[in-house]
Amino acid sequence: MASNKVIGIDLGTTNSAVAVMEGGKPKIITNPDGSRTTPSVVAFKNGEIQVGEVAKRQEITNPNTVRSIKSHMGEEGYTVDIDGKKYTPQQISAMILQYIKGYAEDYLGDTVSEAVITVPAYFNDAQRQATKDAGKIAGLDVKRIINEPTAAALAYGLDKQDKDEKILVYDLGGGTFDVSVLELGDGVFQVLSTNGDTHLGGDDFDQRIIDYLVAEFKKENGVDLAQDKMALQRLKDAAEKAKKELSGVNQTEISLPFIASNDNGPLHLQTTLTRAKFNELTHDLVEKTKIPFENALKDAGLSTSDIDEVILNGGSTRIPAVQEAVKEWSGKEPNHSINPDEAVALGAAVQGGVLTGDVKDVVLLDVTPLSLGIETMGGVMTKLIEKNTTIPTSKSQTFSTAADNQTAVDIHVLQGERPMAADNKSLGRFQLTDIPAAPRGIPQIEVTFDIDKNGIVNVSAKDKGTGKEQKITIKDSNGLSDEEIEKMMNEAKANEEADKKKKEEVDLNNEVDQLIFQTDKTLKDVEGKVSEDEIKGVKDAEEELKKAKADGNLDDMKAKKDTLNEKVQAVAVKLYQQQQSQGGEAGAANGDASKKDDNTVDGDFHEVHDDDKK
């Protein structure tokens, strides 16, 4: 039976998390490692797909390890090549989602089929569609795609519905950056504006440390570590660790022994990185977040004095220089009441609760982050829907032909803020044909844009004269067809079955090893106390099981395991009965002794151990 719960998933660049509503509150579900977040890392090893911490641990040694795949969602033509097979970002993301879905099901004790998944507010249509496709491949019906800052605001404001507040969410994650301004009041969470950069995050801060270490090492030793893949991976791990440590201390040691070698022998990287140096290396990255910060306020028609609370979200907001900058720009001490690693998943769970009716009196009004329009004469982008328009929404505009007797029009759909079509993101093209021949400017072509609650775009074009209509759901050129998604779903299901079988195999092997160990122990205990035939029967069954284990036939192993188990139990029971019988005889003898006359002299006694009997 499927659970009626809608889980909330924060599908992050660096880490992911999942939450569910319980008792009217969102709760993070821990993964099998006991952690509240899961590294967004996938590794392929010996035909097995591994996700999370186990995958992250082998980044240095396993070249078939994929991280930060979110940075490539919706990217045209991007694939990952693993052992000659190409995987799209949607497929890799689906593997992460499948793993999360699995441990959420273990926690809930039910199958999970529905989810709310979060995306950066500044994700375009192609990136949103790719995220939805990833969910579908993983076997999830994605009920809603919501923006990460909005989700963080839901987590913050769930128990503050009686307040009227304007809040600014500054969200700096592993690979993306967003700023959203929201108004909260009477259970309504209304997004006023959003801005950001989908290619700016903690990974960039790590890279600055890596570049610095590479340059310093080359200067000292004449060796370029950037050319050595394994050394580079060790540097990545060290940079991430140093960045985190510098959030709590003023300096940290970076020690990487045997990082390289030259004619004189092995070389070691040993250095101290101070917070001041780290701030110097990353100052421009922090400053890069200022323009979206200011634009979000400007688009909302507000100044910093109008903002009641500034919420920090995303692991990278733990960087002291980031916190100081936000405090300086906003003139307010940022609110630290929500966990920046968990807030988005918690907010997604709240939205899941809204959809199932578990959460009452909460309304979420989000916006489209970028303007939408079509290309018109002269290569101009004509906007139909302006950025920061509340969604869902629909807008129509009438256009005409550009030439006499034109019988078809090409509709080129665009997303962005630039005046010229070529400078914006192309979402797709379609054609309206069979327009009756007429002088230019006479045919009336009505173009309608619909944006659904997930921020996904549908466009239609209608000839008002004939009533003929053509419509499409926008798919990026790297988007997946329904057939491709179906195929990937089947592959994901097959992988899930293979993973399940692999786990069963490991569990069975462990049970067999444990039984063999127990058998050997039991045989020692019963030596000389049961018949030789019984002992031979156990030993023969044990050898049969060992042979089945060596052959790797799971069904045979199960059968032989059950047989051996029965025989071991039988001799163990017999030994127990013998001991009981001996105990009874000893008790009877003691009873007879107690019937002797009362002229008994008390004497000293000592306990007789088995060793004393020998």
UniProtKB/Swiss-Prot annotation:
Keywords: ATP-binding, Chaperone, Nucleotide-binding, Phosphoprotein, Stress response. The keyword Chaperone applies. One of its GO terms (molecular function) is ATP-dependent protein folding chaperone. The modification Phosphothreonine is found at residue 176. Disulfide bonds: none annotated. SUPFAM superfamilies: Actin-like ATPase domain, Heat shock protein 70kD (HSP70), C-terminal subdomain, Heat shock protein 70kD (HSP70), peptide-binding domain. Residues 593-614 have a biased composition (Basic and acidic residues). Residues 577-589 have a biased composition (Low complexity). It comes from the Bacteria. Induction: By stress conditions e.g. heat shock. Residues 576-614 are annotated as: Disordered. Acts as a chaperone. Belongs to the heat shock protein 70 family. This is Chaperone protein DnaK. It comes from Fructilactobacillus sanfranciscensis. The lineage of its organism: Bacteria, Bacillati, Bacillota, Bacilli, Lactobacillales.
